[in-house]
């Protein structure tokens, strides 16, 4: 007599040989079953008009295999919080979220100091959220997210100068004859609070 198993509670795919014939003792053995998605499951065994539902059992995550930026870092001014918050996901081979996994960010391209809480644990959805990041120096940057042996590089983003807080003569006026051009040219420099030049002001 053939017996067929189906996944009757919970999501995912019940893989393996799901139909087996009973042996001389009336027992059908299913030795290669697997389910790809986590959660509480039941399987139903069917033989002709007969059915029976198994006890509930739980599928848990396998090891972390994939790391991705969900919310990429956005452009920001020097010293300002990068918003919206940067988020990173950790999943297993089947896309199941991995919770409780530490993720660390570092500045992998560009100069400056990446400030904020640089290590966060993933939540129940497999997401690590970095809500207080900032960088002090201007330019094009990339972040790298690291979780164990996994790593991923963010899209490029740009840090621009903050509001000017310092003004100084970088080229003082020189003595000159009345009516003559003062040379060399007089120059004035504007810097923000982090020492970045402020352009277009």
Labelled PLM ranges:
Residues 105:
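Major-groove recognition helix of helix-turn-helix-like DNA-binding domains
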Residues 28-31, 128-129:
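Short strand-edge motifs at loop-to-beta-strand transitions and within beta-strands
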Residues 32-39, 134-139:
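Surface-exposed, short loops/turns at beta-strand junctions within beta-sandwich domains
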Residues 2-4, 8-13, 40, 48-99, ...:
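Short S/T/G/P-enriched beta-strand
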Residues 20-22, 33, 54-57, 120-122, ...:
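Generic detection of short hydrophobic beta-strand segments and adjacent strand-loop junctions
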Residues 17-25, 116-127:
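Short, acidic Ser/Thr/Gly-rich low-complexity loop/linker segments typical of extracellular
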């Amino acid at each position: 007599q053939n017996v067929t198993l189906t996944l009757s509670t919970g999501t995912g795919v019940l893989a393996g040989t799901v139909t087996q014939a009973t042996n001389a003792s009336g027992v059908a053995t299913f030795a290669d079953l697997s389910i790809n998605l986590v959660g509480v499951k039941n399987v139903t065994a069917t033989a002709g008009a007969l059915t029976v539902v198994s006890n509930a059992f739980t599928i848990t995550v396998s090891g972390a295999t994939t790391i991705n930026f969900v919310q990429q870092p956005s452009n920001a001014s020097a010293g300002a919080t990068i918003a919206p918050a940067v988020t990173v996901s950790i999943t297993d081979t089947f896309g199941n979220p991995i919770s409780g996994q530490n993720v660390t960010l570092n500045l992998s391209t560009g100069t400056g100091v990446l400030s904020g809480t640089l290590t966060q644990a993933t939540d129940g959805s497999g997401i690590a959220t970095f809500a207080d990041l900032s960088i002090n120096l201007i330019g094009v940057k990339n972040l790298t997210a690291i979780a164990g042996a996994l790593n991923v590089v963010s899209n490029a983003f740009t840090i621009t100068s903050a509001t000017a807080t310092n003004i100084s003569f970088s080229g003082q006026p020189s003595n000159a004859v009345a009516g003559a051009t003062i040379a060399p040219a007089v120059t004035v420099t504007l810097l923000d609070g982090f020492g970045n030049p402020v352009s277009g002001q």
